[in-house]
């Protein structure tokens, strides 16, 4: 595990710890963030902690043909109860991802500094949001970093049932249509697994990132 200086560089991802921690320090400038994502590295830390950079040995990803859409979710889609937009409310989406209550979590890893940094990426066209609306109210969404041919998903939120699933499915459809290789979901969880995501070795993930 390495300590970063102001120099714009990262250690080799193979030098990460067993749990995936690669480096501590540096900053959240757009240049450093883009360099990180180009090399399969992402920031993840809580308010008050130093900036921590991660590159897990196993990467959770979605190959689009493996996407699982349940029968009940297909009914939701067919009823047109949600409106889907892209890049209409990026800041609102990331702020909701920051503030939403999550089971088992007492804090948030989306700091105020991180919000400003990702909003700058969005202004550069490198960060994308998906918004889910119901009766003109934002009820769900997600955001991530566009590193074509890979999209790096960061976080999603839902204020009503199925809203975040709708965002995820809509994003997957958009990425498949536009010839992306895969959707990076970073770390395993049961919810992502239920949607068809699976883990692949880091080296395999990096090959997709470099294609």
UniProtKB/Swiss-Prot annotation:
Cellular-component GO terms for this entry: cytoplasm
Location in the cell: Cytoplasm
A Pfam short name: Leu_Phe_trans
Chemical reaction(s) catalysed: N-terminal L-lysyl-[protein] + L-leucyl-tRNA(Leu) = N-terminal L-leucyl-L-lysyl-[protein] + tRNA(Leu) + H(+); N-terminal L-arginyl-[protein] + L-leucyl-tRNA(Leu) = N-terminal L-leucyl-L-arginyl-[protein] + tRNA(Leu) + H(+); L-phenylalanyl-tRNA(Phe) + an N-terminal L-alpha-aminoacyl-[protein] = an N-terminal L-phenylalanyl-L-alpha-aminoacyl-[protein] + tRNA(Phe)
UniProt-listed InterPro entries: Acyl_CoA_acyltransferase, Leu/Phe-tRNA_Trfase, Leu/Phe-tRNA_Trfase_C, Leu/Phe-tRNA_Trfase_N
EC class (word): transferase
Protein origin, superkingdom: Bacteria
This protein's UniProt keywords: Acyltransferase, Cytoplasm, Transferase
GO BP field: protein catabolic process
Enzyme Commission number(s) of this protein: 2.3.2.6
Single GO term (MF): leucyl-tRNA--protein transferase activity
Annotated family: Belongs to the L/F-transferase family.
Protein name: Leucyl/phenylalanyl-tRNA--protein transferase
Organism: Flavobacterium psychrophilum (strain ATCC 49511 / DSM 21280 / CIP 103535 / JIP02/86)
Gene for this chain: aat
